[in-house]
Amino acid sequence: MVSTYRVAVLGARGVGKSAIVRQFLYNEFSEVCVPTTTRRLYLPAVVMNGHVHDLQILDFPPISAFPVNTLQEWADACCRGLRSVHAYILVYDICCFDSFEYVKTIRQQILETRVIGTSETPIIIVGNKRDLQRGRVIPRWNVSHLVRKTWKCGYVECSAKYNWHILLLFSELLKSVGCARCKHVHAALRFQGALRRNRCAIM
């Protein structure tokens, strides 16, 4: 049986969210930053641990605020489909404090607009541009502790440029969505050693 998951990728301008998606899908990276101005949809099929998953990856341009209801969601073409996804990937640049503040704001708005009684939608926070480690503005431990312990979200650092931890990110994404859909499976994420335990490939 093939599972279909819709995933929204959000982040401030220039954080490399589109670069992450393209590195995952096409194994390519461009040094030229082309701002995302419209919503982009990618439809890859992914095999993980022998199971096929159809992904609908929605790459959104930066939004000023998360839509509070369906009416607001469909009034803005850039936000359509944002409230009905199975998981959110929120990307920030580890060298840009403002981009982390953006992620913090969007995450809070997602929680505030969530329909009461619905199942919790997984959120994974992603720190991109790990290859620019020397320019980091917030210590990794501080961010990791806040995201995992306080926010109860998954956390991954990656480098879209060097394809570092990109596969790990989407492997954990599939695991988190699967956990959210199966109540008998413990939903806590375990990122260390994930690639040794799971096999993930794109068709």
UniProtKB/Swiss-Prot annotation:
Any single biological process term in GO: positive regulation of peptide hormone secretion
Motif position, Effector region: 33-42
Keyword Transferase attributed: no
Single GO cellular component term: plasma membrane
Top-rank EC class of the record's enzyme: hydrolase
Binding residues annotated for GTP, in chain numbering: 11-18, 59-62, 128-131
Catalytic activity: GTP + H2O = GDP + phosphate + H(+)
Lipid-modified residues, S-geranylgeranyl cysteine kind: 200
Residues of the propeptide: 201-203
Topological relation to the membrane, as annotated: Lipid-anchor
Tissues showing expression: Expressed in heart and brain. In the brain, expression restricted to neurons of the cortex, hippocampus and cerebellum. Sparse expression in the brainstem and almost absent in the hypothalamic region. In the heart, expressed in cardiomyocytes. Not detected in interstitial tissue or vascular cells.
InterPro entries, per database record: P-loop_NTPase, Ras-like_GTPase_Reg, Small_GTP-bd, Small_GTPase
Subcellular location(s) per record: Cell membrane
Pfam families named among the record's database cross-references: Ras (PF00071)
EC number of the protein: 3.6.5.2
GO MF assignments: G protein activity; GTP binding
Assembly, per entry: Interacts with CADPS.
Protein name in the entry: Ras-like protein family member 10B
Provenance organism: Mus musculus (Mouse)
